[in-house]
Amino acid sequence: MTQDQLKQAVAQAAVDFILPKLDEKSVVGVGTGSTANFFIDALAQHKTAFDGAVASSEATAQRLKGHGIPVYELNSVSELEFYVDGADESDAHLNLIKGGGAALTREKIVAAVAKTFICIADASKLVPVLGAFPLPVEVIPMARSHVARQLVKLGGDPVYREGVVTDNGNVILDVYNLQITNPVELEAQINAIVGVVTNGLFAARPADLLLLGTPEGVKSLKAE
């Protein structure tokens, strides 16, 4: 199976998982990226089964609207039963690295509101230790150099992601060469740097369920 076929399979599995639990008042949180796009396309086949969605990026909002799915502001929604999103890496505890698509801050906010965070990914994303994928950090533009110096002190090698401005008007530093053995601690350390909006570690609020696309089929993993 191709990577896209694996992504399609996990996207459909996520729809199959949440659909029996949705009703006409349900609002679904939706992530950003190629795997999330497959989820949106699969979810759109059942758009009469729920009320609408909260999007984690402008790109996701446009795709949802293109399918005729109502998109709500998070501030207007009292609760989200589910948040479904992809990941760049996951460990066995379902700590994640996200933010390859630069939507990490809004993704983290929507995930924090959701009762159940479902991560959908192909098998290549499951790793023993996080950090081979560079860790994205969203930064207030004027603090970029300061934050980069602090990230070097933490053992990372930050690289400015040229030409990228987040939906919030900020910039991204991608931090290479981190061996992330304690993701909860590192997430807090980086977020404590003045000028950091947030970083792409989802460890304080990890995923609750990982649907992993493999050549043998979709596997469901809960945190070890």
Swiss-Prot record:
> Would you say which domain of life the source belongs to?
Bacteria
- Residues where substrate binds: 32-35, 85-88, 98-101, 125
Q: Which residues cross the membrane?
A: none
Q: Which Gene3D superfamilies match?
A: 3.30.70.260, 3.40.50.1360
Q: Which reaction does it catalyse?
A: aldehydo-D-ribose 5-phosphate = D-ribulose 5-phosphate
Q: Name one GO cellular component term.
A: cytosol
Q: What's the subunit arrangement here?
A: Homodimer.
Q: Which family does it belong to?
A: Belongs to the ribose 5-phosphate isomerase family.
The record describes the protein's role as: Catalyzes the reversible conversion of ribose-5-phosphate to ribulose 5-phosphate.
Task: Give the protein's recorded name.
Answer: Ribose-5-phosphate isomerase A
Q: Which organism is it from?
A: Pseudomonas putida (strain W619)
Q: Which gene encodes it?
A: rpiA
